[in-house]
């Protein structure tokens, strides 16, 4: 999957959003982050990424951002939002972080699960 120049929307910045931002920026994507929490909840974490061109929409979600994206990557803790469903219905691809990572793996994959898939 070519990410260079593509508009990628990350939904939820909390735990894995930073790593995902770095990954996407390293592949030339134009990154936008949408999170329901206000910017103040993240302290200075946003500053470095904003300086690298990441656009932050904090304190709520703009439906337009979902429809304008070339790809949406919701964080694992994000519930199935109406904005994500609407974008998917319009043909915008929605991939989990794991699905996106899989597309860039070059080696063999071994999957091991425990009880009840944990």
Language-model-detected regions and their locations in the chain:
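N-terminal leader/targeting and accessory segments in enzymes
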Residues: 1-96, 100
């Amino acid at each position: 999957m070519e990410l260079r120049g593509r508009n990628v929307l990350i939904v939820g910045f909390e735990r894995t959003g930073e790593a995902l931002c770095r990954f996407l920026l390293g592949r030339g994507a134009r990154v936008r982050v949408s999170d329901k929490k206000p910017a103040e909840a993240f302290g200075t974490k946003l500053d470095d990424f904003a300086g690298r061109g990441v656009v932050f929409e904090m304190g709520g979600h703009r439906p337009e951002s979902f429809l304008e994206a070339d790809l949406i990557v919701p964080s694992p803790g994000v519930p199935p939002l109406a904005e994500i469903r609407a974008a998917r219905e319009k043909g915008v691809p929605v991939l989990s972080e794991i699905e996106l990572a899989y597309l860039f793996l070059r080696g063999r994959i071994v999957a091991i699960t425990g009880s009840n898939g944990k």
